[in-house]
């Protein structure tokens, strides 16, 4: 008889994968609602497109591999992949982008490795990075939050822009991106990085409409707080563990605080890092992916801290305003090494 050797813990929660995935999907509702409120109906359209694309792509591969389609689709992992990608891209990005990114995520980043449980990288973030590198202009074309927008697209407008690039009134994406100051708007992180490189002072930057006296940007801080609320609910439901989110956020806050204290005129304050971009989405919904994260408690703390450090480094010194996706994938690479050195020692065995 052959016994499989595994590191502790040896007892596991018996809740099915589909139930865990469903809890994560439900926890995403506050974040989705906040994005709909501040950025319009495009987010919902992207979610629908990504969900359908993810299910069809997964079904196709399962059929080709002669595996059970119905049983696998019921685990809800494909839906979660599509959802995470859809909420990460601009709400009015062309329809083919979210389809392409989702199909790539499901087929190449997940099924090519053998399906759920075998993929070393987070599929949604692989799809996001592929789109960001291939189509940087479209992937950074975020709408201004409703409070500072000149043109607020309705549901029909959102569908028209996503599928044709224009709306009935004759406007296009460039028109919809105009803020109250008549300038095309960007995210708070993008605005900060671009303005610092242009020689503007932090005091000037914080007067821009995208900040308008808010801690971390109009709309964006509420979106992050909504994702935080969903994440806290996941912790309460014991669907995720606290180690990764806590170490990630503490490390990011610590690095941002130290950087800001040493260079307040070129580096963003900690509240901007914590409440802008995909910080809370990454902390609770992406980094906590049980397949691609570390499996030991010490390893989870190291994994989260590494991701937090990478996010700060990329945002502060890299070429991209929000480094969550890249940080997640780089941290994924280190998981086997982290797990190797943080495995619990077998009782009775000496170290060395």
Curated annotation (Swiss-Prot):
Give the source's domain of life in one word.
Bacteria
Cofactors that this protein relies on: FMN
Grouped into one coarse class, the protein's main location is: membrane
FMN phosphoryl threonine: which positions carry it?
187
What membrane topology does this protein have? Answer: Multi-pass membrane protein
A cellular component term, taken from the record's GO annotations: plasma membrane
Where do the TM regions start and end? Answer: 20-40, 42-62, 78-109, 123-143, 148-168, 215-235, 242-262, 267-287, 301-321, 322-342
Where, subcellularly, is it found?
A: Cell inner membrane
Keywords from the named record: Cell inner membrane, Cell membrane, Electron transport, Flavoprotein, FMN, Membrane, Phosphoprotein, Translocase, Transmembrane, Transmembrane helix, Transport
Q: What is its EC number?
A: 7.-.-.-
Per UniProt, what is one Pfam family of this protein?
NQR2_RnfD_RnfE
**GO annotation terms (biological process):** electron transport chain; transmembrane transport
HAMAP family, per this entry? Answer: RsxD_RnfD
User: Main role?
Assistant: Part of a membrane-bound complex that couples electron transfer with translocation of ions across the membrane. Required to maintain the reduced state of SoxR.
Outline the subunit composition.
The complex is composed of six subunits: RsxA, RsxB, RsxC, RsxD, RsxE and RsxG.
As for family, the record states: Belongs to the NqrB/RnfD family.
Q: What is this protein called?
A: Ion-translocating oxidoreductase complex subunit D
């Amino acid at each position: 008889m052959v016994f499989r050797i595994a590191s502790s813990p040896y007892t596991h929660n018996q809740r099915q994968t589909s139930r865990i995935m469903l809890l994560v999907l439900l926890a995403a509702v506050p974040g989705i609602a906040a994005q709909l409120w501040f950025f319009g109906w495009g987010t919902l359209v992207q979610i629908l497109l990504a969900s359908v694309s993810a299910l069809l792509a997964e079904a196709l591969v399962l059929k080709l591999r002669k595996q059970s389609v119905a049983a696998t689709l019921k685990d809800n992992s494909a839906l979660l992949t599509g959802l995470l990608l859809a909420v990460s891209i601009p709400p009015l990005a062309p329809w083919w982008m979210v389809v392409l990114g989702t199909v790539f995520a499901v087929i190449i980043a997940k099924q090519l490795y053998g399906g759920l449980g075998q993929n070393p990288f987070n599929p949604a973030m692989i799809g996001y990075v592929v789109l960001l590198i291939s189509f940087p202009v479209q992937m950074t074309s975020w709408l201004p939050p409703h409070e500072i927008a000149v043109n607020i697209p309705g549901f029909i407008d959102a569908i028209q822009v996503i599928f044709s690039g224009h709306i009935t009134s004759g406007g296009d994406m460039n028109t919809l991106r105009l803020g109250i100051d008549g300038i095309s708007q960007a995210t708070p992180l993008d605005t900060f990085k671009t303005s610092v490189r242009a020689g503007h002072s932090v005091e000037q930057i914080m007067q821009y409409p995208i900040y308008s006296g808010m801690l971390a940007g109009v709309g964006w801080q509420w979106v992050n707080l909504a994702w935080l609320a969903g994440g806290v609910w996941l912790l309460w439901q014991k669907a995720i563990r606290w180690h990764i989110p806590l170490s990630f956020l503490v490390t990011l806050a610590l690095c941002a605080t130290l950087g800001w204290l040493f260079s307040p005129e070129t580096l963003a304050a900690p509240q901007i890092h914590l409440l802008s971009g995909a910080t809370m989405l990454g902390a609770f919904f992406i980094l906590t992916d049980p397949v691609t994260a570390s499996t030991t408690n010490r390893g989870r703390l190291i994994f989260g801290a590494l991701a937090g450090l990478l996010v700060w480094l990329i945002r502060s010194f890299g070429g991209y305003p929000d480094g969550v996706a890249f940080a997640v994938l780089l941290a994924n690479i280190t998981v086997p090494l982290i797990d190797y050195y943080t495995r619990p020692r077998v009782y009775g065995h000496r170290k060395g």
